[in-house]
């Protein structure tokens, strides 16, 4: 079979299926999505999978944690010998630079974690013996993924390491440090890691830069920025954790983050306020249009229904009202829930 395999947050399969269908149609490639709610993945079946993968960049996909090109689907695998059918399915393939054996991040998929770990240890030497895997990881060569959907059902897929998530299952394993004011700190940590390339992070998040955090209390996002030695104006009527203020990099203004504006242009504005997504999109657009910030990261809380429609509407609204040339990326991060995180950078 041929198609794209994309992992997602369980429950958001319809949104990912809609996104893949719309984006594939836009680039002129026919196909259809195969999925069930809470599976934690979507299989987009199409004849031109490699061409579609090249046109749908991983960082530009909103609801996909990972993007892979399927090369085979194996059903009815004998649990006593899973290696032989996999080697047969890979006959004629080029040598891979790495192997990841995975499972969906779902209630049905998580019990397969033990199988994935143990089978990876068995498959790796067999692939090397067959000349299908390099002796050491080679990131410049395609990466082989074996995704178990059940003990006797697996998808074989390939990833371009330059255009895919660099973490198994597409999940960055971030540790919540004891001094973090709230779990929301993980959202901004992941956003900086996922939405920006390493080169962009080095260029755009530098010590001495100035930022605003709207709706900052208790200070999770502010704290993440101070760890990058960024000076932060934290705007919230609520209190910040004392140790955040003690960094010497934070000015706490007790004000409404929705109405406050800076006296001078800032390098960054970040916002994780619980508010209607269209209202947030409009306010964020005002910040960009008025030149109050050069770059921004903000969250949009999605409704329970028509989440893909609301996502498109809010992003279109933001870009139209910003009235500037922008590079916009959006992602439902692992640490997001019913929301997406948006990055906008001035061109």
From Swiss-Prot:
SUPFAM superfamilies: S-adenosyl-L-methionine-dependent methyltransferases. InterPro entries: RlmM_FDX, RlmM_THUMP-like, RNA_MeTrfase_FtsJ_dom, rRNA_MeTrfase_M, SAM-dependent_MTases_sf. One of its GO terms (cellular component) is cytoplasm. It is found in: Cytoplasm. Keywords: Cytoplasm, Methyltransferase, rRNA processing, S-adenosyl-L-methionine, Transferase. GO terms for biological process: methylation; rRNA processing. The active site is at 301 (proton acceptor). It holds the Pfam family FtsJ. Its EC number is 2.1.1.186. It is an enzyme of class 2 (transferase). It catalyses: cytidine(2498) in 23S rRNA + S-adenosyl-L-methionine = 2'-O-methylcytidine(2498) in 23S rRNA + S-adenosyl-L-homocysteine + H(+). Gene3D superfamilies: 3.30.2300.20, 3.30.70.2810, Vaccinia Virus protein VP39. Its main location: cytoplasm. S-adenosyl-L-methionine binds at residues 184, 217-220, 236, 256, 272. Catalyzes the 2'-O-methylation at nucleotide C2498 in 23S rRNA. PANTHER family: RIBOSOMAL RNA LARGE SUBUNIT METHYLTRANSFERASE M, RIBOSOMAL RNA METHYLTRANSFERASE FTSJ DOMAIN-CONTAINING PROTEIN. Monomer. HAMAP family: 23SrRNA_methyltr_M (MF_01551). Belongs to the class I-like SAM-binding methyltransferase superfamily. RNA methyltransferase RlmE family. RlmM subfamily. This is Ribosomal RNA large subunit methyltransferase M. The gene is rlmM.
């Amino acid at each position: 079979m041929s198609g794209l395999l994309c992992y997602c947050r369980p429950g958001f399969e319809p949104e990912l299926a809609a996104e893949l269908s719309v984006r594939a149609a836009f680039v002129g490639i026919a196909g259809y999505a195969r999925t069930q709610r809470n599976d934690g993945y979507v299989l987009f079946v199409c004849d031109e999978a490699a061409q579609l993968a090249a046109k749908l960049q991983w960082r530009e996909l909103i609801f996909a944690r990972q993007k892979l090109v399927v090369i085979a689907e194996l059903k009815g695998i004998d649990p006593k010998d899973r290696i032989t059918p996999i080697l047969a399915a890979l006959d004629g393939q080029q040598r891979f630079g790495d192997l990841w054996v995975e499972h969906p991040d779902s209630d049905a998929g998580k019990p397969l974690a033990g199988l994935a770990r143990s089978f990876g240890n068995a498959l790796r030497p067999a692939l090397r013996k067959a000349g299908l895997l390099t002796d050491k990881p080679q990131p410049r060569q395609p990466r082989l993924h074996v995704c178990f959907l059940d003990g006797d059902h697996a998808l074989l897929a390939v990833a371009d390491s330059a255009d895919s998530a660099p973490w198994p299952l597409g999940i960055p394993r971030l540790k919540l440090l004891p001094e973090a004011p709230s779990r929301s700190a993980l959202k901004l940590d992941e956003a900086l890691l996922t939405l920006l390339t390493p080169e962009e992070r080095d260029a755009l998040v530098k010590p001495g830069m100035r930022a605003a955090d709207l709706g900052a209390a208790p200070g999770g996002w502010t704290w993440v920025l101070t760890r990058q030695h960024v000076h932060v104006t934290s705007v919230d009527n609520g209190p910040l954790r004392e140790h955040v203020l003690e960094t010497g990099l934070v000015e706490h203004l007790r004000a409404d983050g929705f109405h406050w504006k800076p006296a001078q242009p800032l390098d960054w504005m970040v916002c994780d306020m619980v508010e209607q997504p269209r209202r947030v999109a409009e306010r964020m657009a005002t910040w960009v249009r008025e030149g109050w910030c050069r770059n921004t990261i903000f969250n949009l809380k999605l409704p329970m229904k028509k989440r893909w429609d609301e996502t498109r509407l809010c992003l279109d609204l933001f870009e139209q009202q910003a009235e500037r040339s922008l590079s916009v990326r959006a992602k439902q991060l692992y640490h997001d829930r019913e929301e997406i995180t948006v990055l906008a950078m001035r061109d």
